[in-house]
Amino acid sequence: MISDVHHVGIAVSDMAAALRFYSEALGLPVVKEGDAPARGARVALIAVGGSYLELIQPVMDGSPFARHIEGQGEGLHHVALRTDDVEALVASLREWDVPLADKRPREGFSGRLSFLAPEAMDGVLLEVVQPTPELSGGNAPTGAVTRIDHVVLRLPDVEEACRRMLYYFGVETKRTFERGETRFSFLRPGDVVLELIGPSTPADAGLRTGPEARDEPLARPSDTGEAGPRTGFIAGLAFECVGIDVLAAELAAKGYPIGEPHPALQGGRIVSVHADGPGVAGVPVAFIDFTDSPR
């Protein structure tokens, strides 16, 4: 049903500044750029290994992306999941009464797509897309940044979100653990990992990850009496890289506020760029180098 994360959408107010960071500074190619009149936006698609970043600048007041920036500021907007048959997938989602913003797939910037409604994943906006052939494979990395390693989703109920990912898309949870009052679950629909973070649930809750879990009823928004999405949001974006010390030094020399590389919990070394940096567009960005600690 779902084969990978196709792209991560970022709402930006200054496309030129965002391209200077995400394309020029990171050495990543822009593979498509143009207008999306129906959405009131200017869009640039940047290849990152086998996936993409989609930079979206609103050019029309009242567009979904203008409203996003007005209400929440620049930043991570949506995660697009790749499918080889968007018509069949959306038909299944309709049959299962999954809340949809696009009840029928439509032509979009990267292919034929449909957005789920925010309440389908407690406020995290998901898209399903069947990309055009030329936007199906990304680009082989040529610089320090090689791929999107993971996307962080912060959710009010991680266990329920994992069950929805299985129910909606057939994506199983690979690993779950708790640290203090926080629960972490990891899903890998393809090359890119989805890291779900939220409050801990009781230790005996028993997350079921096999196919049989799809037979259990979901706690839908209507069941809770809530009219709209809850508190979920896309909380961070991490790239895998090689030569992390050189990359950090180069970004610092170009004026981007970046920390010092240090050991990462998942192995390797990690460094972060401040979300308020020029062109970073409010995104918590991290770079991870697994060279000395391959996964």
Regions found by a protein language model. Name each.
Residues 1-16, 76-83, 131-160, 234-237, ...:
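N-terminal beta-strand motif that seeds the catalytic metal site of vicinal oxygen chelate
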Residues 2, 10-52, 88-111, 153-193, ...:
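Core segments of cupin and vicinal oxygen chelate
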Residues 51-54, 85, 236-239, 243:
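Extracellular/lumenal glycan-associated surfaces
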Residues 54-75, 79, 83, 102, ...:
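DNA polymerase sliding clamps and clamp-related checkpoint/processivity subunits
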Residues 60-63, 241-245:
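A low-complexity, Ser/Thr/Gly/Pro-enriched, surface-exposed linker/loop concept
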Residues 62-63, 187, 196, 231-232:
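Conserved secondary-structure micro-motifs at functional edges
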Residues 87-144, 181, 185-190, 195, ...:
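Vicinal oxygen chelate
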